[in-house]
Amino acid sequence: MSTMYAREYAGNPIKPDVNIFQNKSFKQGEKPKKLDEDYFLYSLKSLFKDNLNEYPGKQLDRPNKLDITAADDRELNFLEEKKWDEKELLKEQRAETFKNFTFPPHMSIQEKCVDQLQQDYDDFHMLCLRDMFRDKECDLEGFSRTPAQDKDELKEMNLTHESLLKEKSKLPLKKQQQNKSSNKINGKLNKKKISPNQKRTIIRQTKTTTTRIFKKPISSMEPITKTEITSKTITRPVTEIPSNDPKSKPKLSTQTSYSVDLSHLNNNSWVWDNGETRKL
């Protein structure tokens, strides 16, 4: 197959005068072979059973004209025309119904004009629903209503609305809790008026500091808890200003030490070594 060449490729016949063996090196006395066109009469079109010259643009939709009779060809043409006519008729019908389409009465102008493109798109796809409910066969009981039924329903709705208002009027009125911010008018606080006979009670709180006086000097007094200084006292140079940083102060902690004999325990550590465990 590597040496096979189609006579026609993409509808253009190859040049007969071009010799495909011209670049080949020949031995002494050997003549270049000529292209045998009878052997290379294969075509991609015949392999796919599709005659592109007879039906341009119809690639595999119809069989090769040579393989069918004239009656079959006429029938295929008739079916194609019928499909095309149905498609065009549907387009015309939909366009006509779209021209005469009216919005539902409950829709307001604001709803119509939110997004006109989206609205037109939705209304166009609502046409099939309108046609469905128009037919007597597909019509449902809930949708087939008379004007008298609509009037009765409106009366019933008004009655229920009025009865609800009556029931609401019987309920006791609750005082609304006034928010504190409601007292502010134009950013000024409405202060309560104090009568001249009424005296204001002012409570003044004073801070008191207690000092304890020891008879003995503090150096001679023993601390309440026995503590040990574990960290060394840090001596800072004089140039630095002393700070009350708790980290710089010596840590005070009580130390308790225990001596536990662990010699009798098997406390070997194990390691993973080349797929095996071994003791250290």
Curated annotation (Swiss-Prot):
Domain of life assignment: Eukaryota
Regions of compositional bias (Low complexity) in chain numbering: 174-188
Region named Disordered: 165-190, 235-255
Name of the protein described by the UniProt record: Putative uncharacterized protein DDB_G0288489
Organism: Dictyostelium discoideum (Social amoeba)
